[in-house]
């Protein structure tokens, strides 16, 4: 287990480890969530992130965990996508996209996440933190904002319920 090996090695040198996690450790039925709310992961990715958090807590003295939500921003060479770039790209190509209208998230600008992580390390702030953007949007509203910002055709956005994507 990579996380366990890293945690054990870092504990040997008393390193402060900052582990990035996700809001997916929650089931999404009662947000926004606080750090002490009970996780309830619904799929493998979420379960693996929660297990990693538990490994960090068990094996380290100096640990911080930062749970974040929908990281977005411009990437070098567009080498990695995010919801903003995906929506811009697909609508920009004239493709119709299905976007959930019943999920709400607080998207996080990558630069803001980096500043939050630096602050945690600089202040030796140990424990569990939720780092996200200041506003909560439906995924649909977020994608509509992307379309508005880039002056794209919003008629290509097809609102759907999450259950229809399963």
Where does each model-flagged region fall?
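Short acidic donor-binding/metal-coordinating loop in glycosyltransferase active sites
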Residues: 22, 68, 133
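Catalytic tyrosine of NAD(P)H-dependent dehydrogenase/reductases that use a Tyr as the general acid/base
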Residues: 42-45, 102
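NAD(P)-dependent short-chain dehydrogenase/reductase
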Residues: 54-105, 111-112, 119
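Mid/C-terminal beta-alpha module of Rossmann-like enzyme folds, strongest
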Residues: 116, 123-166
């Amino acid at each position: 287990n990579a996380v366990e090996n890293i945690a054990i090695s870092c504990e040997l040198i008393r390193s402060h480890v900052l582990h990035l996690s996700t809001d997916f450790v929650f089931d999404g039925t009662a947000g926004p969530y606080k750090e002490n709310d009970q996780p309830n992961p619904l799929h493998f990715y979420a379960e693996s992130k929660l297990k990693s958090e538990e490994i960090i807590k068990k094996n380290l003295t100096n640990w911080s965990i930062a749970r974040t939500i929908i990281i977005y921003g411009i990437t070098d060479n567009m080498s990695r996508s995010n919801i903003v770039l995906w929506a811009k790209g697909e609508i920009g190509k004239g493709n119709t996209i299905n976007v959930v209208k019943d999920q709400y998230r607080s998207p996080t600008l990558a630069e803001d996440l980096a500043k939050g992580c630096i602050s945690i390390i600089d202040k030796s702030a140990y424990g569990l933190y939720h780092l996200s953007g200041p506003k909560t949007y439906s995924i649909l509203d977020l994608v509509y904002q992307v379309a508005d910002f880039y002056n794209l055709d919003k008629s290509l956005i097809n609102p759907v319920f999450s259950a229809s994507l399963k």
